[in-house]
C-alpha cells in the first residue's frame, strides 16, 4: 500500500514555487486579457471587437508558422505520411482564421468610421507574421520583396522564412527522392500518398486564397472600394492584386496535361 502511494505521488506534476498551477496561470489569462487597449475616446463599443479579431488572428498566425516549420522539417526528412498529417492541421488553422472574418462583417461602415481615425498609420499590411507565412509558403518574387521593404528593413522573422526552401521546392525534392514525376503520382495508384500530399498542399493554397478573397470583400464592405488603407496602401485595390498569387503553380499546371494531351 505504501509503495502504491509513493508511486502515485512520484507521477504528480511538480509545483513551481509552491503555487498550484491553475487554468488561469497556465494560460497567463491575467496578462492576456489586459492586452486589449482601445484607443478611442470615449471608448467606442465596437473597437474591442476589432482588436480581439486581429489579436486572435495573430495568435493563429503564430501557430500556423509553428506548424509550417514542422511541415518543412517533415518534408526535408522525406516523411510523406507525417507531412500529410501536418498539412491537414495547417489547413484546419487557415480555415479557423478565415472564419473569424465573419465577425468583422457585423461592423457597419458608419460605426467603423467613428473610431478608424484612432488607428493612426497601423495596418494589417504591417503584420510580420503574415508576411513570414507568405514567404515560407512560396512568395519570393520581386514585387513581394518590394512590398516587404515599404515599411523599412525586412523583419528578422521574414528574413528567416526567406532563407528556407519553399514548400514547392521541398515537394519537388520529395518527388525526386521517390524518382517520380507529378504526372505519375496522379496516374499511378501506388503513388496515392504523394498524390494526397499534393492535394493537401493545394488545399492549403486554396484556403489561403479564400482568406484573401473574403478579406477583400470585407474591406470593401466596410470602407468601400475607393478608400485608402490606414497604412498608406491602396486599400482593397492593393488586396485585389494578391488574390491571383500562387504558391504551387506546378500543382495547378499538371492538371492541364490530362486534358491537353
Q: Language model features by range: what are they?
A:
Residues 2-261:
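Surface-exposed peri-terminal alpha-helical interaction modules
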Amino acid at each position: 500500500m505504501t509503495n502504491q502511494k509513493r508511486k502515485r505521488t512520484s507521477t504528480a506534476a511538480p509545483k513551481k514555487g509552491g503555487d498550484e498551477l491553475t487554468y488561469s496561470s497556465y494560460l497567463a489569462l491575467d496578462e492576456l486579457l489586459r492586452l486589449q487597449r482601445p484607443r478611442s475616446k470615449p471608448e467606442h463599443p465596437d473597437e474591442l471587437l476589432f482588436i480581439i479579431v486581429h489579436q486572435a488572428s495573430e495568435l493563429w498566425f503564430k501557430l500556423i508558422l509553428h506548424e509550417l516549420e514542422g511541415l518543412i522539417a517533415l518534408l526535408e526528412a522525406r516523411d510523406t505520411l507525417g507531412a500529410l498529417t501536418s498539412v491537414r492541421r495547417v489547413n484546419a488553422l487557415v480555415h479557423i482564421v478565415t472564419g473569424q472574418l465573419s465577425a468583422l462583417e457585423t461592423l457597419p461602415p458608419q460605426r467603423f468610421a467613428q473610431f478608424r481615425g484612432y488607428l493612426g498609420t497601423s495596418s494589417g499590411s504591417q503584420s510580420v507574421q503574415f508576411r513570414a507565412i507568405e514567404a515560407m509558403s512560396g512568395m519570393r518574387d520581386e514585387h513581394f520583396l518590394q512590398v516587404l521593404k515599404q515599411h523599412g528593413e525586412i523583419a528578422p522573422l521574414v528574413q528567416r522564412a526567406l532563407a528556407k526552401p519553399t514548400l514547392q521546392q521541398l515537394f519537388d525534392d520529395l518527388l525526386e527522392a521517390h524518382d517520380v514525376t507529378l504526372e505519375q503520382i496522379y496516374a499511378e495508384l501506388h503513388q496515392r500518398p504523394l498524390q494526397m500530399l499534393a492535394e493537401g498542399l493545394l488545399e492549403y493554397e486554396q484556403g489561403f486564397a479564400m482568406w484573401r478573397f473574403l478579406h477583400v470583400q470585407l474591406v470593401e464592405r466596410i470602407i468601400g472600394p475607393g478608400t485608402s488603407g490606414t497604412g498608406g496602401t491602396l486599400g482593397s485595390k492593393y488586396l485585389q492584386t494578391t488574390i491571383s498569387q500562387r504558391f504551387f503553380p506546378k500543382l495547378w499546371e499538371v492538371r492541364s496535361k490530362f486534358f491537353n494531351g
